[in-house]
Amino acid sequence: MYKTLLVTLTASALFTGGVAAAPAVTKEPLDAATLSAIKSNFGRLMKLANNHDFKALHGMFWQSPSTLLVAKSAIQSEGNWAGFWGNEAIDQKLHDIGSSGPVVLEPDYSKLRVVGLTRDVAESYVPMNITVSYAWQDGTARPFLMIINWLRVGKDWKVASEIILPVPPVPAAKG
């Protein structure tokens, strides 16, 4: 009993000390105008994707081998969903998806959230429906989540990573 109490008190003291030592975030690192500009960039990204403007889409991404797109894969050895690193791989993936048939991205702009992580990095999150016929998808609108990390490059904000995740169906209620 004494050992249990001692362990509990020690853990409590360590945990409380760790929380007290954590720096408090007091201010958003990006101002409202910057967050609004990133939201506008997101809207432009969606418009370019829906118009299959591959050249302009290329310009929206950070030009780096570290740029990442997570998307559906058509190659079974890559798995069902995969990461595509670097601009050449991303350009090819976007071209393959866009050339497969109709692709429509419909973000729920009322739920679009953009936050600053640092003065030079932001993150956006939005649920959306995507209609696509790529890689065994049947062209039916389905729910997805899109998470983008934005990087300030000079005066512009570029997509450093775009992660598209399918929302799994709600399990049937057990009765």
Which sequence ranges carry the predicted segments?
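A solvent-exposed, acidic/Ser-Thr-rich amphipathic alpha-helical stretch
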Residues: 36, 54, 58-116
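Short, cysteine-centered beta-strand-loop-beta hairpins and adjacent loop/turn segments enriched
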Residues: 101, 131-140
